[in-house]
């Protein structure tokens, strides 16, 4: 099972560090990253959160959660999501959300265990087509 909200389901260790270095420049708003490292200091998981105020109160998006395949099922994702929820509470976030595919059952369980609820929102996607 893959527990992640990411376009990068199988990042190599060196790619994780490079990916994390680009996070602060990706979205406008305040970017917060929690990382979990193993005993030798390699990143084994991370959670990227974007905080922003669209004029109706501070909102928080869990933009990406990643746990390396060999560390999945060991509580790393739960620890990261607990930190995300703690940050939302500390910062008095009025709305927190995360996006995932419905068929990513492990991610859905992870997010629900952290207190997120399925709001049945329909998201429509547009992709350019060749003309």
Predicted regions located by residue number:
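Conserved acetyl-CoA-binding loop-helix of GNAT-fold acetyltransferases
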Residues: 67, 73-86, 109-114
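Acetyl-CoA-dependent GNAT
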Residues: 1-58, 63, 68, 81-82, ...
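Conserved GNAT acetyl-CoA-binding A-motif
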Residues: 81, 88-100
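Conserved beta-strand-loop-alpha-helix junction that forms the acyl-donor binding cleft
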Residues: 72, 97-108, 125-130
